[in-house]
Each structure stands twice: as C-alpha cells, then as structure tokens.
Amino acid sequence: MAGSGSSAPWGKHLLHAVLMVLVALVLLHSALAQSHRDFAPPGQQRREAPVDLLTQIGRSVRETLDTWIGPETMHLISETLSQVMWAISSAISVAFFALSGIAAQLLTALGLDGDHLTQGLKLSPSQVQTFLLWGAGALVVYWLLSLLLGLVLAVLGRILGGLKLVIFLAGFVALVRSVPDPSTRALLLLALLTLYALLSRLTGSRASGAQLEAKVRGLERQVDELRWRQRRAAKGARSVEEE
C-alpha cells in the first residue's frame, strides 16, 4: 500500500511533464513559424521558413496529436485557440498603439523625436501573438527544467549521502588501524564524528525544511477545508431551523 501510494505522485508528475513537453513543442513550433513571418525582412517573408530540428519535432507532435485526437477535432481546437489568441493579441496591440501615441506626444512636447523613440511599441497583433507564444513556451520550459533539476538534485542528494557514509567509514577504519596512541585516536575520531554530524546537519536541513514547508501547506489546506465544511454545515442548520 505504501509503495502504490508513493508511486502515484511520481506517475502524476511524469504525466504532467509529458503533457508539458507536448505543449511546449507545439507552442515553440507555432512561435517559430509566426516569428519567421512577422519579423523577417520584407524580401524574405515570402520564402519558406527553414526546416530545423525544432520545427520537425513540432510537426511530428502535431501529426501525432492528429492521429490520437483526430484531424477534425485537432483542427477545431487549433482554430479556437487561434481565434482566442488573435483576440487577446489585438487588444494588447491596440493598447500598445494607444500608449505609443501618448508617449510620442509627451516626448514631442519635450523636444524629442517621439515617433522614432516609440516606434518599438507599435506592435501588430501578429507580432504580439509571437511574443505571447514564445513567452508561454518559455514558461513551460522553465517549469520542466525546474522539475528536472529537482529530480536530479534529489538523486544527487541520495548519492552524496551514501558517498559521505562510505568516506566516513573508510576514515574510521584508517584511523583505528594507523593511529596507535589511544588519546590521539580518540581525538581524531571525535573530530571525524563532529565533521560528519555537521555535514549531515547542513545537507539535511534543506530537505527537512522543504518537507516541513510542504506539510505546513497541506495542513493549512486541510484547515481551510474544515472551516468551509463547518460554515456550510452551519448554514444548512440555520436553513433547517428557519423552515
């Protein structure tokens, strides 16, 4: 029972990681295609985008999703997301154009070339959409890297803990065998034990602090849930008394 309970969170994390990888690849594929259309020079916008490794992976993921979900469903989802992204990008573009106009007037009143200085704020909806896609992809990749680094650090912590124990045992055996004087041997063993205890405290404090923080958050959620249930039960009792 304990093994199945402990393996369930790892399965959820793995599923979330796989889904996030798929989403990141799709977003980056869309961002690459969009940025090539929007930010390329005028003479190169009509050329076909160069097919790199990331674009090939994005197309493969898109074909896989078409196979799993279905081309029609995937097309409907893609069109819906495109319309939503276009509406958001258009609103942001209008806001940036208004902001650039106000800033240009203020800079012109100060004797500066306001139109030239605020040219970078005049973004089209397609350019805003490109920034949003790259930003979403960067956030997903950041989450994946954080998860991966957490797993790597956890594994390295276990390995370093075992290595620390092996080094301590080797030092203990070497001291007992090589130091003939009992007083010197006792002092060296005391120093070795003190060093081992300090290293154990320093390496274990971070993990214990993170575990304690997670437990505190879990208890806070449970307390909030109990309060909500008590309020709901009190409201139900009041309604019954009024009836």
Swiss-Prot record:
It comes from the Eukaryota. Widely expressed. Expressed in skeletal, cardiac and smooth muscle cells, in brain, including neuroglial cells, cerebral cortex neurons and cerebellum, but not Purkinje cells. Also detected in Paneth and Goblet cells of the small intestine (but not in the epithelium), duodenal gland, pancreas, parotid gland, testis, thyroid gland and adrenal gland, as well as in epidermis, choroid plexus, ductus epididymidis, lymphocytes, fibroblasts, endothelial cells and seminiferous epithelial cells (at protein level). It is found in: Nucleus outer membrane; Endoplasmic reticulum membrane; Sarcoplasmic reticulum membrane. Pfam families: BRI3BP (PF14965). Keywords: Endoplasmic reticulum, Ion channel, Ion transport, Membrane, Nucleus, Sarcoplasmic reticulum, Signal, Transmembrane, Transmembrane helix, Transport, Voltage-gated channel. Coiled coil: none annotated. This is Voltage-gated monoatomic cation channel TMEM109. It comes from Oryctolagus cuniculus. The gene is TMEM109.
